Amino acid sequence: MMEAKAVGKHLRISARKARLVADEVRGYDYKEAIDILRFTNKAASSMIINLLNSAVANAIQMNESLDPNSLFVKKIYVDDGPIMKRFRPRARGRASRIRKRLSHITVVVSEIEKKVS
């Protein structure tokens, strides 16, 4: 059983929003996951498509005879990254803090187990 992994670090999207998209494709095979992400109208979907393609490319690099259609999304998880703090000027000389959240997304693909009969 072969696994390949791709990690996106410091991606400019909040982990809460990215988890909504990641939960949609967990467990699906590669082609079906790409189709789901293509028709998902969220900013995180394009980031996850890039990571999924990278994980498949990593798997093919490890085993060149591997068929990409025999892979599925074994694990996908989103962790909180650092928070960029910015300030917005407000009335009467005050300022409000703006927290721009970053996230780390990890995608693990694995081969679909073939049943021996």
From Swiss-Prot:
Cross-referenced InterPro entries: Ribosomal_uL22, Ribosomal_uL22_bac/chlpt-type, Ribosomal_uL22_bac/org-type, Ribosomal_uL22_CS, Ribosomal_uL22_sf
GO terms (BP aspect): translation
A cellular component term, taken from the record's GO annotations: cytosolic large ribosomal subunit
Pfam families xrefs: Ribosomal_L22
One annotated GO molecular function: rRNA binding
Keywords: Ribonucleoprotein, Ribosomal protein, RNA-binding, rRNA-binding
Span of the signal peptide: none
SUPFAM superfamilies, per database record: Ribosomal protein L22
Function: This protein binds specifically to 23S rRNA; its binding is stimulated by other ribosomal proteins, e.g. L4, L17, and L20. It is important during the early stages of 50S assembly. It makes multiple contacts with different domains of the 23S rRNA in the assembled 50S subunit and ribosome.
HAMAP family assigned to the protein according to its UniProt record, in alphabetical order: Ribosomal_uL22_B (MF_01331_B)
Subunit structure: Part of the 50S ribosomal subunit.
Family, per entry: Belongs to the universal ribosomal protein uL22 family.
Name of the featured protein: Large ribosomal subunit protein uL22
Natural source organism: Leptospira biflexa serovar Patoc (strain Patoc 1 / ATCC 23582 / Paris)
